[in-house]
């Protein structure tokens, strides 16, 4: 049985572990437990063929910046996560996570995942963001960033309600099995 290695990265507390636990067990975890490194495996059918989807959770905290890349070798697809209610985590997709993944694994497909969509319209969250002169990240902003960074795709989900959750991993499988052809820039190069 072929194995697909999918590594999940992103800032601490954006919902990476909840995403994985909710997907693999269909239950939302009650407590926040910061991750150092964990992995999960699920069997998925693609057509008539079974695949093992190996899901590797990583710690987003800076304390683990040197340890985290040890989980990167042989990765087939990365999920770079941010919380739609954390503009700072969205900014770090571009400033930290994409550069880190590209440095260690150039050419490996990347999907950007907006998490915690169930909180996008939460009054308490909206008030907190408003006080900071911020607002939740929109789907359009996520799609624009994915295009700008040449990610395979942008997808959103809620681990709590499971809305969009299966799509995240379906897209990861497709990206791993059919890596995109990187188009060369059509700009003229003068030597």
Swiss-Prot record:
Spell out the CDD domains in the cross-references.
Cdc42 (cd01874)
- Short sequence motif named Effector region, residue ranges: 32-40
Q: Where is the lipid attached (S-geranylgeranyl cysteine)?
A: 188
User: What residues does GTP bind to?
Assistant: 10-17, 57-61, 115-118
Propeptide feature: residues: 189-191
Listed SUPFAM superfamilies: P-loop containing nucleoside triphosphate hydrolases
Tell me yes or no: is Ligase among this UniProt entry's keywords.
no
Q: Where in the cell is it found?
A: Cell membrane
Keywords of this entry:
Cell cycle, Cell division, Cell membrane, GTP-binding, Lipoprotein, Membrane, Methylation, Nucleotide-binding, Prenylation, Virulence
- Enumerate the NCBIfam families for this protein: small_GTP
State the name under which the record lists this protein. Answer: Cell division control protein 42 homolog
- Its gene? CDC42
């Amino acid at each position: 049985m072929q194995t697909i290695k999918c590594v999940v990265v992103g800032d601490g507390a954006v919902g990476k572990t909840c995403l994985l636990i909710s997907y693999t067990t269909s239950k939302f975890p009650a407590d926040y437990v910061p991750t150092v490194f964990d992995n999960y495996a699920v069997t998925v059918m693609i057509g008539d063929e079974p695949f093992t989807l190996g899901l590797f959770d990583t710690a987003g905290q800076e304390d683990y910046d040197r340890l985290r890349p040890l989980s990167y070798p042989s990765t087939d697809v990365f999920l770079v996560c941010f919380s739609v209610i954390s503009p700072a985590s969205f900014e770090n997709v571009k400033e930290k996570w994409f550069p880190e993944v590209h440095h260690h694994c150039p050419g490996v497909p990347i999907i950007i995942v907006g998490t915690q969509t169930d909180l996008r319209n939460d009054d308490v969250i909206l008030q907190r963001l408003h006080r900071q002169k911020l607002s939740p990240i929109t789907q359009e902003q996520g799609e624009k960033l994915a295009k700008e960074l040449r990610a395979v795709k942008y997808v959103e989900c809620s681990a709590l309600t499971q809305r969009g959750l299966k799509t995240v991993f379906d897209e990861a499988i497709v990206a791993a099995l059919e890596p995109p052809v990187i188009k060369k820039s059509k700009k003229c190069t003068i030597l």
